[in-house]
């Protein structure tokens, strides 16, 4: 089973396309939609829904995948739920770049500080990060610098921030998922 978390643009038709692409890895892809506007509520909701999906799915090698803001959540929720994660262009600093788009961007600082101390060290090698060299929204080099000590970084030379085409990375994701 693969859980898919959308980015800030929850209504983008690209989300459906990504789910269809992920079904080449596993036919059981669960799209979990969340508000994107209320970070604390989103975290509680996502924890509950992802845990429920894992319990119902019965796949010992479940995976959570997210793009942009969904990548922020995939890393944290996947860690807390004990499953591997794939993050495409994860937005690691929504408190800096989501002002005016969400009600309380400062809640992301609170969430980051309340996550288990050193969680990335404890999560080492359990997240695969795919970054676009042409991300028009985020500083990919900064993201790589923060995550490279803990996770494998895969660079993509064609996609932009929304990462419409996952297909060049599906085999790598499939291999990563089989590691459980």
Swiss-Prot record:
Q: What is this protein called?
A: UPF0227 protein YPO1616/y1776/YP_2238
Q: Give the family from UniProt.
A: Belongs to the UPF0227 family.
Q: Which HAMAP family match?
A: UPF0227
Q: Which domain of life is it from?
A: Bacteria
Q: Which InterPro entries match?
A: AB_hydrolase_fold, UPF0227, UPF0227/Esterase_YqiA
The protein's matches in Gene3D superfamilies, at most eight in alphabetical order, are given as: alpha/beta hydrolase
One GO CC term of this entry? cytosol
Q: Which organism is it from?
A: Yersinia pestis
Recorded GO MF terms = hydrolase activity, acting on ester bonds
């Amino acid at each position: 089973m693969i859980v898919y978390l959308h980015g800030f643009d929850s209504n983008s038709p690209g989300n459906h396309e990504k789910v269809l692409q992920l079904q080449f890895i596993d036919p059981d892809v669960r799209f979990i939609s969340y508000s994107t506007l209320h970070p604390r509520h989103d975290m509680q909701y996502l924890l509950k829904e992802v845990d429920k999906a894992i319990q119902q799915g019965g796949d010992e090698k479940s995976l959570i995948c997210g793009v942009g803001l969904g990548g922020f959540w995939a890393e944290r929720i996947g860690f807390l739920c004990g499953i591997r994660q794939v993050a495409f262009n994860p937005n690691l600093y929504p408190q800096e770049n989501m002002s005016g788009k969400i009600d309380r961007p400062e809640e992301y600082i609170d969430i980051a500080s309340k996550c288990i101390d050193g969680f990335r060290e404890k999560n080492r090698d359990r997240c695969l990060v795919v970054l676009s060299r042409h991300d028009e929204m985020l500083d990919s080099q900064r993201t790589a610098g923060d995550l490279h000590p803990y996770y494998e970084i895969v660079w993509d030379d064609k996609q932009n921030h929304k990462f419409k085409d996952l297909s060049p990375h599906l085999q790598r994701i499939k291999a990563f998922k089989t590691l459980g």
